[in-house]
A protein has these predicted regions:
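A glycine-rich, often tryptophan-bearing local segment used as a flexible ligand/cofactor-contacting loop or short
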Residues: 2-64, 124, 130, 136
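Short, surface-exposed beta-strand/loop micro-motifs that present aromatic residues
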Residues: 94-105
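Active-site Gly/Thr loop motif
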Residues: 68-77
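Short, solvent-exposed loop/turn segments at secondary-structure junctions
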Residues: 11-13, 89-90, 107-109, 115-118
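Short, hydrophobic/aromatic-rich segments at coil-to-beta transitions
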Residues: 77-86, 98
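Loop/turn elements at helix/coil->beta-strand transitions in domains of secreted/extracellular proteins
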Residues: 1-3, 107-108
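A short acidic/glycine-rich loop-to-helix N-cap element
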Residues: 117-127
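Hydrophobic/aromatic beta-strand patches that form the interior of the parallel beta-sheet core
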Residues: 5, 84, 110-112
Length: 141
């Protein structure tokens, strides 16, 4: 059991593994990003534990973000994954690969392209609340 949180990655020519092998099931990496820090989230799985425990994540948690929402989102997903949030820059299609999760064995795998590396040093409260949810998640054996 346990939780593995994998933060953003990008495809490169020196990768040892294909980008489809970053998780227990296949997904592709893209260079997709959402750069408008005010982009409104759409919650795709409102009842998912990662959006509710220990903190109920709402639109308010995405206020005050700096520079961008995220980058290197997932593209094609194996059906085992649940995409949790979608965003889009103005005039663009929504991207739902910024935060995905799946149960695997007795644990949970999470991939996120959310720009925590910018939000946490900037002291954005909602980023801390969401990250706390990611690292404190539990699964049922």
């Amino acid at each position: 059991g346990g939780t593995l949180v994998v933060q953003y990655n990008t495809k490169s020519s020196d990768m040892v593994l294909p980008d489809t092998l970053f998780g227990p099931y296949a997904f592709s990496l893209t260079r997709d990003r959402v750069t408008v820090e005010e982009a409104q989230p759409t919650f795709l799985a409102k009842d998912h534990p990662l959006l509710n425990t220990p903190n109920k994540i709402t639109e308010k948690d995405f206020e005050g973000w700096v520079q961008e929402r995220g980058l290197y989102f997932c593209g094609k997903l194996d059906p085992h994954y649940t995409p949790l949030i979608a965003w889009n820059d103005p005039g663009e299609q929504p991207l739902n690969g910024g935060l995905i999760s799946c149960d695997h064995g007795k644990g949970r795998y999470i991939y996120t392209g959310i720009s925590f590396f910018r939000q946490l040093p900037a002291g954005v409260p909602g980023a801390y609340r969401l990250f706390a949810n990611l690292i404190s998640t539990r699964t049922t054996p």
